[in-house]
């Protein structure tokens, strides 16, 4: 029990240190992604919105148990990350290439695809023009 407890504390401390570093990177994140803030689209059921803060990345990763909140994903200059939701419940996280405007990945809980997976990808692809416009704004 002692080793498990120590490991849990170490993991928590590591996450807290990563989160502190991420907060320090918030300004750089805003410079990279600020032009996309407020970008959101829907098909009537699914709402896909840009993650607008480093904290949003952590919350998204923690809620869906995948890596978007780690490895400084928020500082990747050539991708944009969205949260796909239904009734404000997170369904999948979507990463879009800002080079070719194709979905690189879309992952639900524990990196699984959901029943809405294809629909989410189609929604993002259908709205690529809106995203592209923000790049030149």
Question: Where in this protein do the model-derived segments appear?
Answer:
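Catalytic-core elements of nucleic-acid end-processing and repair enzymes
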Residues: 3-137
């Amino acid at each position: 029990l002692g080793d498990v407890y120590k490991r849990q504390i170490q993991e928590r401390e590591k996450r807290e240190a990563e989160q502190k570093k991420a907060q320090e990177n918030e300004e750089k994140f805003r410079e990279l992604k600020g032009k996309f803030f407020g970008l959101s689209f829907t098909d009537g059921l699914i709402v896909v919105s840009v993650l607008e803060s480093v904290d949003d990345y952590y919350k998204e990763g923690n809620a869906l148990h995948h890596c978007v909140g780690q490895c400084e994903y928020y500082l990747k200059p050539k991708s944009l990350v969205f949260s796909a939701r239904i009734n404000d419940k997170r369904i999948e996280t979507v990463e879009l290439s800002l080079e070719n405007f194709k979905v690189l990945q879309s992952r639900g809980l524990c990196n699984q695809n959901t029943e809405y997976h294809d629909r989410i990808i189609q929604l993002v692809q259908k709205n690529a023009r809106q995203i592209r416009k923000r790049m030149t704004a």
